[in-house]
Amino acid sequence: MPTPNAASPQAKGFRRAVSELDAKQAEAIMSPRFVGRRQSLIQDARKEREKAEAAASSSESAEAAAWLERDGEAVLTLLFALPPTRPPALTRAIKVFETFEAHLHHLETRPAQPLRAGSPPLECFVRCEVPGPVVPALLSALRRVAEDVRAAGESKVLWFPRKVSELDKCHHLVTKFDPDLDLDHPGFSDQAYRQRRKLIAEIAFQYKQGDPIPHVEYTAEETATWKEVYSTLRGLYPTHACREHLEAFELLERFCGYREDRIPQLEDVSRFLKERTGFQLRPAAGLLSARDFLASLAFRVFQCTQYIRHASSPMHSPEPECCHELLGHVPMLADRTFAQFSQDIGLASLGVSDEEIEKLSTLYWFTVEFGLCKQNGEVKAYGAGLLSSYGELLHSLSEEPEIRAFDPDAAAVQPYQDQTYQPVYFVSESFSDAKDKLRSYASRIQRPFSVKFDPYTLAIDVLDSPHAIRHALDGVQDEMQALAHALNAIS
């Protein structure tokens, strides 16, 4: 049952907490600029789904779009039923293909399954090639002589990367809250900031998977912005951040150059994460499409921006930037259980429909970005959107928002707030519990295969046949034998 956030001793009224800050911090947190619209993966996923639905408003146009076009010729794969008629329906169907000058590559008939009284006795499978413009007319004519005409291409699997090197293709930026495009962006009127952003973004555009991430020489103003964000948030972490974040943050300060007067370099941080959990960073020029971003997680690759928020708005950014990535995401990705949780979301996204991408993006929003967890009888923050935003971190653990137990089915369809602070947060019993619930949710997503990440080849194994599954089981058996040997050695 939803409850107000009364689980933490530090919970208090949000406005009371803000009133205890100095005037500058309070103004920054409550200003319209701070609570302005934020970008998220959900917006992009929703746009992609709506675009797909618009394209599918006509069933025939949707079918035509699904078929492969080659030099103006449409390659069709069709299934249809043949009713018992005079003249035979097969003869009439072949006549349709002749009329539209189709080149038949394959034609096969088989008894309909299951055969019921009154149902057509035969099904027909046809693969053919016809001029693209005549596809709608051919379908219309075929439906007059056959039943249940459908295209096998309608259930085609969308492309997704199979090898880590193919992440070079996963760099599609969405229309974003950009200093060049949006009047409300704090950097819109700052030409120097806009040019700086373009210069840093070029690193991401030129990057190839496996290359060292080029260093950025940050300016004095950028470092000053980092210092204000770093020192302000660091003072709040001991009472508001989860244990895993605190432990990783201490290690990052000891071994990775995290400090007030220096912005960490992505290459150094990436090497640290690789040793801890196998995650790596990859430079990104801005907010990526939801499908591309989630696919990267499947390979334990986190697409990470290098530019920093504008100096006039240090307490908040409406888009991904390095304070959000380095202070919010990176410490959590250094935890093994949370890293696995993040990868599981990515694996669940591979090859699924736009509708499922939107749901997974919403799940990501309410967990990885704005998630809460229980620890030692208190509620703590683990979401990067909370841990990189002073005002939202205060708000999330105050008495104002509604706190609900984490349920992936509910979180995946929960309306989110991008105009101000979240009115609803989901709290997990533990990361392990959240991981188990996510895997249960992902197992119900409809796709004609399963996937498995191979950490040796950094590739995705598609489990779509008995042979592929047997091959995967061989690897599991090898690991089990090694563990059994280890148990024998210590017993």
UniProtKB/Swiss-Prot annotation:
Record protein name field: Tyrosine 3-monooxygenase
Chain positions found as Phosphoserine: S19, S31, S40, S465
Keywords linked to the UniProt accession: Catecholamine biosynthesis, Cell projection, Cytoplasm, Cytoplasmic vesicle, Iron, Metal-binding, Monooxygenase, Neurotransmitter biosynthesis, Nucleus, Oxidoreductase, Phosphoprotein, Synapse
Similarity comment: family membership: Belongs to the biopterin-dependent aromatic amino acid hydroxylase family.
Oligomeric and partner information: Homotetramer. Interacts (when phosphorylated at Ser-19) with YWHAG; one YWHAG dimer bounds to one TH tetramer and this interaction may influence the phosphorylation and dephosphorylation of other sites. Interacts with NT5DC2; the interaction results in reduced phosphorylation and decreased catalytic activity of TH.
Cofactor(s) required for function per UniProt: Fe(2+)
Post-translational changes noted in the entry: Phosphorylated on Ser-19, Ser-31 and Ser-40 by several protein kinases with different site specificities. Phosphorylation at Ser-31 and Ser-40 leads to an increase of TH activity. Phosphorylation at Ser-40 activates the enzyme and also counteracts the feedback inhibition of TH by catecholamines. Phosphorylation of Ser-19 and Ser-31 triggers the proteasomal degradation of TH through the ubiquitin-proteasome pathway. Phosphorylation at Ser-31 facilitates transport of TH from the soma to the nerve terminals via the microtubule network.
Free-text function comment from the UniProt entry: Catalyzes the conversion of L-tyrosine to L-dihydroxyphenylalanine (L-Dopa), the rate-limiting step in the biosynthesis of catecholamines, dopamine, noradrenaline, and adrenaline. Uses tetrahydrobiopterin and molecular oxygen to convert tyrosine to L-Dopa. In addition to tyrosine, is able to catalyze the hydroxylation of phenylalanine and tryptophan with lower specificity. Positively regulates the regression of retinal hyaloid vessels during postnatal development.
Known catalytic reactions: (6R)-L-erythro-5,6,7,8-tetrahydrobiopterin + L-tyrosine + O2 = (4aS,6R)-4a-hydroxy-L-erythro-5,6,7,8-tetrahydrobiopterin + L-dopa
Residues carrying the site annotation Important for substrate specificity: D418
EC number(s) per entry: 1.14.16.2
Ligand binding (Fe cation): H324, H329, E369
GO biological process: dopamine biosynthetic process from tyrosine; heart development; hyaloid vascular plexus regression; response to ethanol; response to hypoxia
Source organism of the structure: Bos taurus (Bovine)
Tagged with keyword Oxidoreductase: yes
Protein location: Cytoplasm, Perinuclear region; Nucleus; Cell projection, Axon; Cytoplasm
